[in-house]
């Protein structure tokens, strides 16, 4: 006989395509539904042997009908004997502990562990930092294996294509600016035809649905390598720097940035940038403030990537002291009052306590930046076979989420999303 089965070529395509169910412990990426031609029917020949299939029998050898008859009559088979696994030789014979609560009961199987998992992670939680430069070719970054200064057109677009394929739709831009364009006042930062505005326009033209974050700071544009204008006595000028940052943020918003991210740590810059954006009509452009940015030693590879090391001194007069905890509350209160939409902690893993502090004291979304030093340490450990790179990568991201981060800026974003989608991580 012939049976009629309804199907669609689109459905067949989805079944044959890559599975994206995700890593069991972390969550998964969302598949994009496909559309196809309307449903049609096909006749499928079923053989006579299939029509006359033998009766289904229970493990005992009886048919289903016989089992049902026994159940109606109240005759139930005896349960199999409970066989306890043997303990190894030499295990002491003891009376079980008189415990009412045994937390291990909820961990004894993968299904139970998944049911009670408190924290999850998905590609939607990840923001991929992108290093860009004026050249056409991608240039590898020696201190950050797997990362490149991307050619601002071809290499950049290819990286975004690949990231979107695994569910990463948020990106933050960091430019390597030619020395010839750097100055003490960092005027190139608000050039509407500069590298960052051009890149924003390119990305928004090709991928209008992505979220573009931008960095608001003068260090990539400063001949001194600092986040602000440097006075002749070496003091970083706060208010004059904020004035420049406002122009930079407006230029980025004009190009199409979704979120501007002041990382400079100047006092009062969030409120000033909010006022400047609103005055230009950019009421819907968000501000992600680097609220608790510490003067950390974990930034080394990043500064190599952008050639943005300070020409003298350090950044301790404006970035936070790594020994301080409560000070983060002062910065949080100020940024909230000035109109920040997202609060960020940088670095990430060494400052889990600060992430939790902000999470417990603010209703705003919390971001964590897993910085270049954190990334490079995991990469180096994996390359030397001292750790399992993939497992440590995923655990580190889960820890940031567990501490309270809603989103994570990480150079592992695409690699981690591959894992979440059940693909190879490299």
Swiss-Prot record:
This is Delta-aminolevulinic acid dehydratase, chloroplastic. SUPFAM superfamilies: Aldolase. Residues 1-45 form a transit peptide. Its main location: plastid. PANTHER family: DELTA-AMINOLEVULINIC ACID DEHYDRATASE. Catalyzes an early step in the biosynthesis of tetrapyrroles. Binds two molecules of 5-aminolevulinate per subunit, each at a distinct site, and catalyzes their condensation to form porphobilinogen. Homooctamer. The lineage of its organism: Eukaryota, Viridiplantae, Streptophyta, Embryophyta, Tracheophyta. InterPro entries: ALAD, ALAD_AS, Aldolase_TIM. SMART domains: ALAD. It is found in: Plastid, Chloroplast. Mg(2+) binds at residue 331. 5-aminolevulinate 2 binds at residues 372, 411. GO terms for cellular component: chloroplast; cytosol.
């Amino acid at each position: 006989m012939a049976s009629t089965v309804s199907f669609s070529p689109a459905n067949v395509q989805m079944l044959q395509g890559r599975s994206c169910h995700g890593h069991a412990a972390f969550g998964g990426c969302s598949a994009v539904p496909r559309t196809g031609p309307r449903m049609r029917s096909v006749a499928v020949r079923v053989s006579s042997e299939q029509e006359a299939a033998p009766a289904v029998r229970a493990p005992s050898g009886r048919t289903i009908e016989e089992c049902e008859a026994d159940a109606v009559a109240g005759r139930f088979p005896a349960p199999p004997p409970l066989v306890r696994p043997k303990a190894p030789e030499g295990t002491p014979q003891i009376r079980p502990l008189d415990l009412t609560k045994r937390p291990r009961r909820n961990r004894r199987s993968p299904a139970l562990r998944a049911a009670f998992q408190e924290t999850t992670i998905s590609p939607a939680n990840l923001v991929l930092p992108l290093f860009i430069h004026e050249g056409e070719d991608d240039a590898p970054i020696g201190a950050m294996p797997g990362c490149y200064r991307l050619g601002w057109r071809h290499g950049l677009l290819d990286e975004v294509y690949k990231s979107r394929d695994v569910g990463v739709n948020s990106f933050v831009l960091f430019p390597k600016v030619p020395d010839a364009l750097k100055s003490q006042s960092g005027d190139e930062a608000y050039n509407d035809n500069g590298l960052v505005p051009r890149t924003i326009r390119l990305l928004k033209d090709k991928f209008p649905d992505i979220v573009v974050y931008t960095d608001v700071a003068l260090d990539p544009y400063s001949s001194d390598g600092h986040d602000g204008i440097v006075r002749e006595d070496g003091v970083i000028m706060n208010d004059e720097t904020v004035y420049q940052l406002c122009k930079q943020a407006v230029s980025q918003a004009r190009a199409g940035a979704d979120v501007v991210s002041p990382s400079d740590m100047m006092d009062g810059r969030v409120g000033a940038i909010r006022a400047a954006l609103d005055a230009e009509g950019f009421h819907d452009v968000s501000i992600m403030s680097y609220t608790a940015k510490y003067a950390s030693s974990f930034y080394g590879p990043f500064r190599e990537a952008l050639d943005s090391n300070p020409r003298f001194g350090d950044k301790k007069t404006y970035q936070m002291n790594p020994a301080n905890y409560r000070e983060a509350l002062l910065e949080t209160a100020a940024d909230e009052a000035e109109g920040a939409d997202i609060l960020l902690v940088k670095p990430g893993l060494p400052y889990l306590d600060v992430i939790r502090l902000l999470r417990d004291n603010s209703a705003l979304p919390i971001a964590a930046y897993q910085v270049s030093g954190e990334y490079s340490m995991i990469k180096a450990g994996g390359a030397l076979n001292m750790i399992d790179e993939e497992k440590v990568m995923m655990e580190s991201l889960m820890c940031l989420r567990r501490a309270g981060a809603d989103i994570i800026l990480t150079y592992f974003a695409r690699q981690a999303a591959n894992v979440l989608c059940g693909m190879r991580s490299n």
